Each structure stands twice: as structure tokens, then as C-alpha cells.
């Protein structure tokens, strides 16, 4: 994911920072423990599409 885009995007729930998990193609909000999918290179920034992160910290690439 392009770093300029990543610097611009924020979590739609808390407006916090997102980290890109390249291996899973997801944008991670650690504050809300949500992972937003990136499909065909397009971030899907809908809370209804996000999955809940496990209690263990996720690795980012």
C-alpha cells in the first residue's frame, strides 16, 4: 500500500492511526482492535466489514 495513502487514512470509528498488515492485506486499528480488509488494492473502510482482532498483538509487515 502506498505510504501517502496510509498516512491519509484513519480508522472510521476512532479516527486513529492505521497500520498495514501486508501478509493479510488488512489495515489495523490497534485502539479499536479492528482489521479493515484491502480488496483488489482498495481499503474497505466500513465498520461492518472489519473483523475483530485477537487479544494477541498482530504482526505488521
Swiss-Prot record:
GO cellular component term, pick one: cytosol
InterPro entries registered for this protein in UniProt: Trm112-like (IPR005651)
Pfam family, one: Trm112p
TM helices/strands, residue ranges: none
Organism domain of life: Bacteria
Family from the record: Belongs to the UPF0434 family.
PANTHER family: PROTEIN PREY, MITOCHONDRIAL, ZGC:162634
Protein name: UPF0434 protein Bpet2671
Organism: Bordetella petrii (strain ATCC BAA-461 / DSM 12804 / CCUG 43448)
Higher taxonomy: Bacteria, Pseudomonadati, Pseudomonadota, Betaproteobacteria, Burkholderiales
Amino acid at each position: 500500500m502506498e505510504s501517502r495513502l496510509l498516512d491519509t487514512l484513519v480508522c472510521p470509528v476512532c479516527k486513529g492511526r492505521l497500520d498495514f498488515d501486508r501478509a493479510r492485506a488488512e489495515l489495523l486499528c490497534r485502539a479499536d482492535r479492528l482489521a479493515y480488509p484491502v480488496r483488489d488494492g482498495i481499503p474497505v473502510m466500513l465498520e461492518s466489514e472489519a473483523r475483530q482482532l485477537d487479544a494477541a498483538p498482530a504482526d505488521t509487515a
